């Protein structure tokens, strides 16, 4: 994240300089600078995400759109793609975040595998100054005064091409026990890197794990850190976008959790980090996602 933050917030040359540096003292200084840049990236991301969610909360009908389109003045263009991903994960539908300045908007969109974002933008091309990307991610430039018309056009197209909303698909690579998530095992997964659109990060399903602890995460407590337990084995998972008070699972609840695993360097050495992609009561399978999709279709007036 620190290397990526340089290109998002400053210049990628800072990250390149660190990778090429052969002097340990100079490298430490550059690394410290990258940490500062990454902190700025995190703050900008949190501020823009909060502003976007506030706009959507003020107009609840927009959350029922097939494609979420939200814009704001002066949002940092380097992080709007990350915010679009957060909105897509939260609402389970394609999301486009647009930063406006001097009458022009620069947007970044993300979409689940069930939706072709590039095809949607092609259908709206007359309203755009330029655009590019692929089915899952795209960027665009638009005149600010046309954002409203663009929102209507892309949702009209989506309603025609995708008449019944589908739940956000989540591909699981394997079922795992918490006891199997050891540092050596997770380190082996790095041999599958680099990860990206054509080679996504592996997702593991932890079944029938008990919620054994819940703590706020982040400077403002907008996220959760949850301890899950299976017998004598336990792990900590991070759930972003959900505060502890909003978590529907209490202590002792049995859940199924889909997680991405990675290694981070803690004070005591390498440790396993788990990011929770989805969580639901144990044993329910796909029922909650399918029911949510049907309910959204009902609210938006779609024939069931």
Predicted regions mapped to residue ranges:
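Acidic, two-metal ion nucleic-acid-processing modules in DNA metabolism proteins
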Residues: 1-53, 89, 109-304
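Flexible, glycine/threonine-enriched loop-and-boundary segments that flank and lead into catalytic domains
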Residues: 54, 58-85
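Residues immediately flanking
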Residues: 72, 85, 100, 144, ...
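Short, glycine/serine-rich, charged loops/turns that create anion-binding
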Residues: 23, 74, 102
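General beta-strand structural signal in soluble alpha/beta enzymes
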Residues: 70-71, 97-98, 130, 257
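Short glycine-cluster motifs
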Residues: 96-111
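Long, contiguous hydrophobic alpha-helical segments, chiefly transmembrane helices and signal peptides
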Residues: 79-80, 105, 257
């Amino acid at each position: 994240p620190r290397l990526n933050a340089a290109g998002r917030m400053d210049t990628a040359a800072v990250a390149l300089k660190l990778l090429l540096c052969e002097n340990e003292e100079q490298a430490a200084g550059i690394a410290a600078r990258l940490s500062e840049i990454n902190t700025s990236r995190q703050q900008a991301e949190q501020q823009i995400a909060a502003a976007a969610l506030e706009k959507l909360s003020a107009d609840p009908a927009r959350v029922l759109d097939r494609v979420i389109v939200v814009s704001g003045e002066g949002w940092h263009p380097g992080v709007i793609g990350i915010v679009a991903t957060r909105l897509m994960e939260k609402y389970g539908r394609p999301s486009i975040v647009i930063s406006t300045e001097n009458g022009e908007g620069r947007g970044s969109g993300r979409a689940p595998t069930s939706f072709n974002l590039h095809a949607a933008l092609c259908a709206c091309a007359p309203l755009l100054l330029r655009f590019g990307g692929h089915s899952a991610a795209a960027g665009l430039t638009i005149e600010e005064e046309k954002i409203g018309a663009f929102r209507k056009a892309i949702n009209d197209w989506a309603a025609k091409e995708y008449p019944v909303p589908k739940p956000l698909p989540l591909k699981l690579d394997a079922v795992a026990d918490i006891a199997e998530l050891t540092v050596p095992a997770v380190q082996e997964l790095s041999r599958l890197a680099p990860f990206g659109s054509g080679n996504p990060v592996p997702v593991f399903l932890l079944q029938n794990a008990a919620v054994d602890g819940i703590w706020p995460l982040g400077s403002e407590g907008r996220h959760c850190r949850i301890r899950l337990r299976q017998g004598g084995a336990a792990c900590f998972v991070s759930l972003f976008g959900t505060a502890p008070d909003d978590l529907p699972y209490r202590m002792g609840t049995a859940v199924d959790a889909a997680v991405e695993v990675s290694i981070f360097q803690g004070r005591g050495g390498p440790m396993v980090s788990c990011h929770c992609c989805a969580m639901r009561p144990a044993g329910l399978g796909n029922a909650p996602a399918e029911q949510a999709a049907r309910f959204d279709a009902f609210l938006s007036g779609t024939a069931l």
